[in-house]
Structure formats: structure tokens, C-alpha cells
């Protein structure tokens, strides 16, 4: 009788450990799915205006509970509403959606081509290839491609790269 109780207790403990491990692995998979769903809703500008290096990192922070869903400036009201719907959250920030005017700003960079020496440092560091030009010739920025990461600004030896504030329309 005692032996059967001991065997039953050991088997119950082992089964409990197995169930715990399986539930942990299933939770990770559902988190990855949720991270990917959130990432698909974001505009994929990799602008870092939310404080994260890219949209995927911001998605991970949202799922981990370390960040709120209201930091994607380029996404505007549309993305906030989609994220609220996906995560079943309502606007806990009061008038946040009303404060998102139609003229929300974002930043890009602009090169003063008259002062550009063509060193190509900006072109080489640009993560989205928004800077075009060849070595020893003037460079320019493709405004539609620039994400405003500003990685190129400190590298310019002539300080001809400036941040420019744009408005969403």
C-alpha cells in the first residue's frame, strides 16, 4: 500500500513537471505569433521614433508588457486603433487619440549638396539605402526612403546633413 502511494506520488510529480514544461513552450509560441501579428500592423519604417531600433523590437516590448501601444508616431491613429483591437485594449490614455492631429511630425535628414564632399560615410551607414551618390561626388537623400534614424548626421565631416521635420498629411 505504501509503495503504491510513493509510486503514485512520484508519477504525479513527473507528470506535473512535464505539463509545466509543455505549457511554457506553448506560451512562447503564442507570444511569437502575437509579436508577428503586431509587427505586421506597424508601418515598418524602422524609424526608431518609438525608442526601439525597429518595429519588431517594439512589438516584442509590447508583448512583454514593457511598453504601451501608443508610441508609433508614423502609424498614427490608424495603427493605434488596430493595436487596441488586436490586443483588446481600450484607450487608457484618455485623450491620446484626439491629441494625434492630422499633422503629426516625423523627421528625415537633408543634405546640403553644396557643402557635400562626397566622402560616402552617410551612404555606407544608412540602413535603408536612402542616401545616394558615389565617392567624391555630391550625395542626396531619397525623402521617401529616409526613416529619420539620424545615423548619418554625426559621421558627416562637413556638417552638411541636417535633421528636417516633416508633417504627415
UniProtKB/Swiss-Prot annotation:
Protein location: Cell inner membrane
Cofactor(s) this protein requires: [4Fe-4S] cluster
GO terms of biological process kind: electron transport chain
InterPro entries attached to this UniProt entry: 4Fe-4S_dom, 4Fe4S_Fe-S-bd, 4Fe4S_Fe_S_CS, Elect_transpt_cplx_RnfB/RsxB, Fe-S_Ferredoxin, RnfB/RsxB_Proteobac
GO molecular function, one term: 4 iron, 4 sulfur cluster binding
Function comment: Part of a membrane-bound complex that couples electron transfer with translocation of ions across the membrane.
Family to which the UniProt record says this protein belongs: Belongs to the 4Fe4S bacterial-type ferredoxin family. RnfB subfamily.
Protein name: Ion-translocating oxidoreductase complex subunit B
Organism for this UniProt entry: Buchnera aphidicola subsp. Baizongia pistaciae (strain Bp)
